[in-house]
Amino acid sequence: MSTPSQLPTVALTTGEPAGIGPDLCAALPGRRLNCRVVLLADRSLLGRVRGERRRMNALPDYDPAARARGRVEVLHVPLAAACRAGRLDPANARYVLSLLDRAVDGCLAGEFDAMVTAPAHKGVINDAGVPFTGHTEYLAARCG
């Protein structure tokens, strides 16, 4: 956890890989940030926004010891299946949940000070056979 003299570290899950989350996250580098952001994502998703591949590939890998203001890092979490923007695939439901799980685990362990979640598609997670009513209920169950 951060102290008043330290910079907070925020875990940002990129959500449904076929959705808007990876695109929103690709807009972060270069913005003025008063925190350190750790993007939890498959690196290949971050570069799919036209013209952003070079900049996103240049983002550093997550380093727990780094505490630079405005730093955006990537904690690579591999996709379960190939992904195309706008095409939902139940095979990636576990990927979406693994992003949430990693962020929750990091928050509970004090590795991250907070987490922000990009949209997840409830229907495709349910189609994969995983009961899911939303982020709030999932996080509440994980945190007890």
What are these regions (language model features)?
Residues 1-143:
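Contiguous, glycine/small-aliphatic-enriched amphipathic segments in soluble metabolic enzymes
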